[in-house]
Amino acid sequence: MSIKFGIMQGRLTKTNSNVLQKFPTDWSKEFDFIKKTSLDYIEFFTEKNFNKKNPLWSNNGIKKIKKKISKVNHKEIIVCDNYVISHSLDKISTEKYLKLLIDQLKNF
């Protein structure tokens, strides 16, 4: 069995907020830091409210993520979805959101 250790996104750079799950403004810099560690991955996340600045939501952003992942020799992407924490799973809007997220993740 192979055990992997990673870190949640936003823990390797400073944020201007006391919010625990705040998407980092300069997310790509975290890959520079992870190269200096023996960590296996950075766990991306979505926030409780839709954040269009998160690169997971655009094809161009996904290309940037893939490029950064390959530069640190990581082979996979791990995502934690926080949107469903504050949005009911039985709502149509949440269903649409989750379908969009799944469609975006298929680009990896």
Predicted regions and their residues:
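N-terminal pre-domain/capping segments
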Residues: 1-106
